[in-house]
Amino acid sequence: MDIGVHVLGSVTSNENESLGLKELIGTKQDRSGFIGEDCLQRSLKLARTTTRAEEEENLSSSVAAAYCKTMSFHQGIPLMRSASPLSSDSRRQEQMLSFSDKPDALDFSKYVGLDNSSNNKNSLSPFLHQIPPPSYFRSSGGYGSGGMMMNMSMQGNFTGVKGPFTLTQWAELEQQALIYKYITANVPVPSSLLISIKKSFYPYGSLPPSSFGWGTFHLGFAGGNMDPEPGRCRRTDGKKWRCSRDAVPDQKYCERHINRGRHRSRKPVEVQSGQNQTAAAASKAVTTPQQPVVAGNTNRSNARASSNRSLAIGSQYINPSTESLPNNRGVSIYPSTVNLQPKESPVIHQKHRNNNNPFEFGHISSDSLLNPNTAKTYGSSFLDFSSNQEKHSGNHNHNSWPEELTSDWTQLSMSIPIASSSPSSTHNNNNAQEKTTLSPLRLSRELDLSIQTDETTIEPTVKKVNTWIPISWGNSLGGPLGEVLNSTTNSPTFGSSPTGVLQKSTFCSLSNNSSVSSPIAENNRHNGDYFHYTT
């Protein structure tokens, strides 16, 4: 309060007393850290420019002195710019603040470390020169000229600035504008400019930026969530270990760990190859229920004529004599227990190929069943097994069993379904004579699987309702069915068959009960014939 009284008194006295006031105010301002010479010059100028009465002059002087006092206490910003605290009085008067003057643009090049040359100024973005400079503000301590306190820190914002960018962002914008100039001029951009920008954005410095880009950095995602080693599998054990493999493109994990967390059922099911399916289908044979046939014994003294028949099981059943016929297609079902013999073992009897009445067994057609050389007057004839055919493979004569061997034979009777796609023609048996004709059936020459059957019984009947065709299969020594019988012993022994019913009887066996119907038999009923196959 004393300072205010002295100021008011000194101003109202006269100009001669202004020196004492200058000394008093100067000492007070020096102690407070503020230069009071500016306030004195302002008060003197205001006193000289007034043309009013002495009271008005005293009032204006007192207001100016009080303003200088408050500014000294609050460390306010002076209302006059001065280039240096040691400038002259005339210089200070010329630089007195005028609110109508436009502020000069502030050059940031000296703060960001860029060159102040004309070329560098031209390389800057146009809008950089139009942004107003930051304003001055009061500070409790620091540096400045004439009491101007200004914080020009490179790391943060201006305290009182409402501008859109910080100084660091200004520097980056200038650098990007320079890079843009290089690009528009089709000149390679120096690596120093690019590296500095990457380092400013990427927190790890030496490591390359992540695949998330720079946008996530500005959004606040560049922190602990960023992968320090992009491109590496992120599979860990929850501790320090991490998989060293490279990750699959656009994925987090490598090929080994990419399916680790998924359920097993989501993996694609491996489709079996066509070969596996074909092999499975070929190995699976379709079998039908086999019904036993009760065979009756007949006279042992009947003569038996034997002829070889071979039935091949495979995908194709082709008779060499009728390969060109279009009706050799059909569906045939055979049991899976067949004889496995080499191709050259069965003796093939092909006679009367010019016969126009082929007989189809399944979808196998033969030339004819009529063979006048082997005609017998007995009621039935059979297809028997012969092991001597392997020894006499080149011989085309029939091997007949002696009468002694037929008494103790154990025979297997079972029904075999026979299906045909085309109607089969029958042999000429119009006179209903008990005449047996034997002719071998060549069913297929392609496969090694063959079935040798015993003598075929052709029995004339009178339009019977029963249309089943039972075929008796003989037992074999080594296999389930179809092995050749040993003819060197008088009473050969036979192994038991896993399928069918074993019956102790002679070759002359008649069976009236059967279980499988065939279109062959249906065609034969019209001619009065009934085919009966048994052994």
Swiss-Prot record:
Keyword field contains Transmembrane helix: no
GO BP of this protein: DNA-templated transcription; negative regulation of cell population proliferation; regulation of DNA-templated transcription; root development
Compositionally skewed regions (Low complexity) per UniProt: 299-308
Tissue: Strongly expressed in actively growing and developing tissues, such as roots, upper stems, and shoot tips containing the shoot apical meristem (SAM) and flower buds. Detected in young leaf primordium. Also expressed in mature flowers, but weakly expressed in mature stems and leaves.
Domain QLQ residue range list: 164-199
Record field: compositional bias (Polar residues): 272-291, 426-437
Origin superkingdom: Eukaryota
Record's subcellular location: Nucleus
Pfam families assigned to the protein according to its UniProt record, in alphabetical order: QLQ, WRC
Bipartite nuclear localization signal, short sequence motif: residues: 232-242, 260-267
Gene Ontology CC annotations of this record: nucleus
Annotated disulfide bonds: none
Described purpose of this protein according to its UniProt entry: Transcription activator that plays a role in the regulation of cell expansion in leaf and cotyledons tissues. Component of a network formed by miR396, the GRFs and their interacting factors (GIFs) acting in the regulation of meristem function, at least partially through the control of cell proliferation.
Subunit structure and binding partners: Interacts with GIF1.
Protein name in UniProt: Growth-regulating factor 2
Protein species of origin: Arabidopsis thaliana
